């Protein structure tokens, strides 16, 4: 770092520290690892480079967006908004209510369904429809109920709702049981299935630590077609399942942070930083891997990342 940047950084930190009571933020922390990683990177930069104070608040998408909309400071920022998965929330609070700001610096996300490479190769599983084969479903049936388990996501995930509709519209329900459980359960099941040579299929996405942790492959799906992708979320319609139809792969995603507009008045330096914050899919995969596979604390991983990427952080802070 140059001397001028060092001096500017010191002045910024000291000026913000002088009014530290005004420069505080509560960061929402969803359950998936990538979101936890980004939340702590945001928090590390706020504390170590801006001089503010941070509180981490666990919550699902609905809880975080509702708190940002209220603007009372209960939760100020969502660290990992996947679009169009969470579009029902951004339409309501960003486009219509105008109470939440969505970052203009997204990274690219991709999602689908995966199997371990060994399981896929041994049973010629390459496409989502292969899961409807009775021989494959039998290999994935760990509880003996006659249906193979397919992890579709965690409770509260918009993507889990999409995947529940997909299992129906891909014609899998005669053979497959969609399962919702926390992501840690899925990770443990992947590890266990590999150790025991069992079959397992699961919702997967990039960026994610799973690509570093295990040898997995994403199954093919019909190419994204908006005419075959009509998804209604529970927040918009109580009959969302009946009124949805998804028989195609998801489009590539844009993933970014979002924050309450009230933050601009309460913590302007932090809000300005959020507007410039940017990471890549590779950044997020690497961070998630350190947390999930190497068992590091998210705060420790974030601190190491910020120290290793000081020039990029400087740019986000306008230094």
Where are these regions (language model features)?
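A conserved helix-loop-strand patch within extracytoplasmic ligand-binding domains
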Residues: 98-151
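C-terminal functional modules
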Residues: 250, 263-264, 271-319
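Extracytoplasmic "Venus flytrap"
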Residues: 24-40, 61
